[in-house]
From Swiss-Prot:
The lineage of its organism: Bacteria, Bacillati, Cyanobacteriota, Cyanophyceae, Synechococcales. The keyword Ribosomal protein applies. This is Large ribosomal subunit protein bL36. It comes from the Bacteria. One of its GO terms (molecular function) is structural constituent of ribosome.
Length: 37
């Protein structure tokens, strides 16, 4: 899980979602998981 100020899709499988007011990226590649901090 990467925590960064700007979350972006890193590949075609990445999905940008909102959970509990946080912007997150979920992906089948574990390396691509991000959340906004």
């Amino acid at each position: 899980m990467k925590v960064r100020a700007s979350v972006k899709k890193m590949c075609d499988k990445c999905r940008v979602i909102r959970r509990h007011g946080r912007v997150m990226v979920i992906c089948s590649t574990p390396k691509h998981k991000q959340r906004q901090g």
